[in-house]
């Protein structure tokens, strides 16, 4: 039932009014109609919905109950125990439709005042209109119909100047901008089901229909910008810029606030090869030193600095009661805009007619007054406080090496490399932060028990957890005993501590292009090495025995121990799935021995107790069930793993047809190309062949893989014609 259609067009026009004024305009329009977007079914394989022997072709039509709706055992439906029946019902009976319209018009006027002074006025708008209609059949039916739209408009004007006086060059611009964005949302839906199932109109609601709508957010910004460019003898250049923003997002209800903020920059470069042109070796084409310092300011979300409230209803037997509630985010009276101060130095080197080129950059940046939310005691009536958090530092290097090892009349081989390495550090945080700020996940709650945090002295996004394996005063791992399964498992530390860093050691790429006459082949690799991720599909899939990792110790072939049980209820049975974890039992551990007696095994070695015949090896199923269950997990390489990969990102074949052929077809030039992207991984460090690029989001603090996301490749054939 899922489809996607899109229609789009782009129109551009220019016109010269006279010798010194010309105008240009364009409109970009697209209309998309997605229906029933694909669902993320990856978690179904680890949350118990589907088992490894699940046959979707067999079960996909066995979900309906006799009285209608999803099959249920309490109605005596024959398909009441079908796994995943709700999923199949929703796939078949739910209907989610959207219609997205995007319009982006632009307009500009260019005026040539003198030979060295120009003026430009421009305006653009980004209009996004989304309408949705959701139909859900079944218990708690809902027919959600609504839309939301976003307007973004920008108006600007700028003066540009360029003037050369003997050995000196002066240029630059002065510009002003006005930016406005507004977001509206409207929705209406049924409540409590429908009077007549399958009749899709909101007045068919059993209970009074619910609606919501209005202006959700609005922000305006005024900006004044200037740039000054100076040059001397085409050797030395100096650029100075400045910008002042006035943001409505930092204006308090009483019209105060730090809504105006200025941030400058300065950069310089020296072309060494021009200064020493007479003495420079001929094989050096370019040698440039560059350095810069810049400051960037940033505001926050609309309404973030002002107290707001939510509007809701409570359903009563005689109608609805309308309620208002203040938000749970505490505001501060003097929120400052964020500031990022950065500097960098670099070298650009071109040699051998640009066949060997090197770009090197070292940078360092500090973000101060970063706007973040910190947790506060709920007894205060709020749950979080918006603050200027502190000082976050980033530094690193970037290297690009471009080479052409072979270049002849018909052949050319290009080989390019990039390398980037970034390191971050939390220099300081807000005084109200006792230890750390959680950025993503939860250090000691829910099924997470691991989170990326901001902690003074550590990297941004360092990972902390309270479920590392506990150890005694001598550093020996501690174990617990499960008497029902007669097996040991790792004891949790219950103390939050740093377990690693999510930041990669480095990122890199390799691209090579081989060209023979008009035919070329390009291959691109991307790579990442280092940095931790937490895979919950590995965690729960291993607990349930659905991953390759859970095969270890299952039988002798996979390292399992063989023994004959001496417990009374299993005496004489031979098992082949045994393992003996390293460690001693934690204080207060009582275990039932082989002879049926109970014994305090605190501080005793599990391996020694097995050797003495008092306990037996732990079954593999018990080990995985206890160590990887919801809330019982402990940090190990299956759940939290170093992420490294080499991706085969792109293969492209391009052929430029001879002019004799393209001219016959009425074209000046004709190119044919075939591209294949994301073809797979030459190296992948994650267990169980997980997709290494399936981290939940692109956030700088995200480290989680929640489901089995499939590998997706794309194949594109392109015809490019010039007329």
Segments (PLM) and residue ranges:
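Extracellular/periplasmic, surface-exposed regions of secreted and cell-surface proteins
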Residues: 12-21, 26-31, 39, 76-134, ...
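Conserved small-residue
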Residues: 304, 387, 404-502, 533, ...
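Low-complexity intrinsically disordered tracts that form flexible linkers/tails across taxa
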Residues: 34-58, 429-435, 565, 570, ...
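Short, surface-exposed beta-strand-loop junctions and turns on beta-sheet-rich folds
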Residues: 127, 486-487, 528-530
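Acidic/polar loop-and-plug regions of large Gram-negative outer-membrane beta-barrel proteins
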Residues: 35-102, 322, 475, 483
């Amino acid at each position: 039932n899922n489809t996607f259609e899109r229609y789009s067009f782009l129109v551009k026009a220019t016109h010269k009014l006279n010798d010194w004024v010309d105008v240009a305009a364009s409109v970009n329009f697209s209309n998309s109609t997605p229906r029933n977007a694909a669902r993320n079914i990856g978690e179904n394989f680890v949350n118990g919905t589907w088992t490894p022997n699940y046959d979707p072709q067999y079960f996909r039509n066995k979900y309906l109950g006799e009285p209608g709706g999803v099959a249920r055992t309490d109605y005596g439906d024959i398909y009441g125990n079908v796994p995943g029946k709700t999923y199949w019902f929703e796939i078949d009976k739910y209907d989610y439709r959207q219609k997205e319209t995007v319009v982006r018009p632009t307009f500009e006027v260019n005026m040539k005042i003198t030979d060295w002074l120009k003026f430009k006025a421009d305006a653009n708008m980004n209009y996004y209109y989304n309408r949705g209609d959701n139909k859900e059949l079944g218990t708690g039916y809902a027919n959600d119909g609504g839309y939301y739209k976003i307007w973004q408009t920008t108006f600007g004007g700028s003066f540009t100047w360029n003037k050369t006086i003997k050995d000196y060059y002066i240029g630059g611009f002065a510009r002003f901008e006005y930016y406005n964005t507004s977001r509206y949302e409207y929705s209406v839906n049924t409540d409590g089901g429908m009077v007549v199932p399958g009749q899709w109109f909101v007045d068919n609601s059993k209970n009074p229909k619910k609606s919501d709508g209005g202006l959700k957010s609005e922000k305006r910004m005024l900006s004044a910008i200037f740039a000054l460019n100076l040059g001397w003898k085409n050797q030395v250049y100096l650029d100075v810029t400045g910008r002042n923003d006035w943001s409505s997002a930092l204006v308090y209800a009483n019209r105060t606030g730090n809504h105006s903020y200025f941030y400058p920059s300065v950069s310089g470069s020296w072309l060494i090869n021009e200064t020493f042109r007479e003495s420079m070796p001929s094989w050096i084409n370019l040698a440039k030193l560059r350095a810069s310092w810049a400051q960037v300011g940033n505001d926050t979300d609309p309404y973030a600095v002002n107290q707001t409230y939510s509007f809701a209803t409570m359903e009563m037997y005689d109608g609805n009661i309308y309620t208002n509630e203040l938000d749970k985010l505490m505001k501060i009276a003097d929120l400052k805009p964020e500031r990022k101060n950065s500097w960098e130095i670099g070298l650009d080197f071109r040699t051998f007619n640009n066949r060997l080129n090197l770009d090197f950059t070292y940078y360092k940046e500090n973000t101060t007054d970063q706007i973040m939310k910190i947790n506060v005691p709920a007894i205060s009536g709020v749950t979080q406080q918006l603050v200027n958090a502190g000082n976050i530092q980033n530094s690193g290097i970037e290297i690009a090496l471009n080479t052409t090892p072979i270049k002849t009349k018909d052949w050319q081989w290009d080989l390019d490399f990039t390398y980037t390495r970034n390191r971050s550090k939390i220099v300081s945080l807000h005084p109200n932060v006792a230890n750390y700020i959680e950025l993503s996940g939860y250090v000691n709650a829910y099924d997470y028990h691991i989170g990326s945090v901001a902690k003074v002295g550590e990297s941004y996004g360092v990972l902390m957890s309270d479920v590392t394996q506990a150890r005694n005063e001598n550093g020996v791992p501690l174990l617990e005993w499960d008497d029902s399964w007669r097996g040991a498992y790792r004891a949790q530390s219950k103390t939050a501590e740093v377990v690693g860093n999510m930041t990669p050691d480095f990122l890199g790429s390799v691209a090579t292009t081989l060209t023979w006459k008009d035919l070329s082949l390009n291959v691109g690799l991307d790579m990442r090495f280092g940095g931790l991720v937490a895979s919950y599909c590995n965690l729960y899939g291993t607990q349930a025995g659905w991953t390759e990792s859970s095969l270890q110790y299952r039988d002798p072939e996979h390292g399992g121990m063989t023994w004959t049980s001496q417990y009374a209820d299993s005496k004489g049975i031979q098992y082949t799935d045994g393992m003996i974890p390293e460690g001693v039992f934690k204080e207060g551990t009582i275990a039932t021995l082989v002879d049926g007696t109970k014994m305090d095994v605190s501080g005793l070695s599990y391996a020694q107790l097995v050797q003495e015949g008092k306990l037996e090896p732990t079954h593999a199923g018990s080990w995985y069930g206890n160590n990887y269950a919801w809330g019982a997990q402990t940090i190990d390489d299956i759940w939290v793993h170093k992420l490294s990969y080499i991706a085969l990102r792109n293969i492209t074949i391009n052929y430029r047809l001879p002019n004799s052929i393209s001219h016959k077809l009425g074209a000046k030039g004709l190119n044919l190309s075939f591209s294949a992207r994301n073809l797979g991984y030459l190296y992948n460090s994650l267990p169980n062949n997980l997709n290494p690029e399936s981290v939940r989001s692109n956030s700088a603090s995200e480290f989680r893989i929640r489901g089995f996301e499939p590998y997706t490749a794309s194949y594109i054939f392109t015809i490019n014609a010039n007329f």
